[in-house]
């Protein structure tokens, strides 16, 4: 997909993605240079894994921002915060709103538990929601009355904090439904291992340019780190919260 027209920039989220129209006529949130190479890799890898895992993730793609579009200078922040070349694009859902404590109650438990386990697997601590607020990085699509999963830029976190995860994750209240049931845990282990069968295909799909911040300067994540995080699901201590 090629990006054709800039429509604005989001003021929400740490990366403040740009809003663009693609050559398919659809509108996307787009993350590029400003988000960081690590972020792009995490988004792309996690999005594909989420699809294979069965999560209701918003449609996504790798998009190309032409040099000529940046050169037009329609926004002063495009060159620094987006840049030309390959970027990560997530389709805008026109009838979606950020998940709240109220709409959280509408999410089916099986879907919520899937999200919880997936975030545990990917060490994604960035999905907070308590009665006092938070940033769940989840949307409620009012047109279809369903959940939409977005934002995995902080996945594969080397500083993942188990205590914080279990206290503030949007679906943490369902943890014991998994942790306390051996059959459920075994089913999820089987599911995760099946997803891992496509891991080399996922790796091959990552643009080579994303592995480098600059000439000779690697991105702040390695494939070995991603693979090690995901391979935890094979270990007996995968569910250990101590």
Mark where each language-model region is.
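Solvent-exposed, non-transmembrane amphipathic alpha-helical segments
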Residues: 69-70, 77, 138, 158, ...
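Conserved ATP-binding subdomain of kinase catalytic cores across diverse folds
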Residues: 1-101, 115-125, 143-145, 155
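Active-site-proximal flexible loops/turns
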Residues: 38, 133, 158
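Short, motif-level signal for alpha-helix interfacial/capping segments enriched in acidic residues
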Residues: 97-107, 130-131
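Conserved catalytic core of the tyrosine transesterase superfamily
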Residues: 109-112
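C-terminal catalytic region of ATP-dependent kinase domains
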Residues: 141, 145-242
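Catalytic-loop signature of eukaryotic-like protein kinases
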Residues: 124, 129-140
């Amino acid at each position: 997909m090629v990006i054709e027209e800039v429509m604005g920039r989001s003021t929400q989220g740490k990366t403040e993605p740009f809003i663009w129209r693609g050559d398919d006529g659809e509108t996307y949130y787009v993350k590029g240079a400003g988000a960081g190479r690590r972020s792009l890799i995490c988004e792309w890898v996690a999005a594909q894994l989420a699809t294979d895992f069965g999560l209701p993730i918003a449609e996504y793609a790798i998009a190309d921002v032409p040099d000529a579009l940046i050169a037009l200078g329609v926004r002063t922040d495009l060159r620094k915060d987006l840049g030309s070349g390959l970027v990560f694009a997530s389709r805008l859902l026109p009838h979606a709103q950020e998940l709240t404590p109220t709409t959280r109650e509408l999410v089916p438990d099986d879907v919520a538990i899937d999200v919880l386990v997936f975030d545990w697997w990917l060490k994604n601590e960035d999905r907070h929601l308590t009665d006092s607020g938070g940033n769940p990085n989840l949307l409620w699509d009012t047109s279809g009355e369903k959940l939409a999963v977005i934002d995995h830029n902080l996945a594969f976190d080397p500083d993942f904090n188990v205590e914080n995860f279990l206290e503030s994750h949007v679906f943490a209240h369902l943890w014991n439904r998994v942790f306390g049931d051996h059959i459920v845990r075994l089913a999820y282990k089987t599911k995760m291992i099946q997803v891992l069968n496509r891991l080399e295909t996922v790796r091959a799909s990552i643009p080579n340019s994303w592995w480098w911040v600059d000439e000779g300067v690697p991105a702040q994540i390695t494939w070995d780190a991603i693979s090690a995080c995901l391979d935890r699901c094979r270990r007996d201590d995968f569910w250990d919260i101590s």
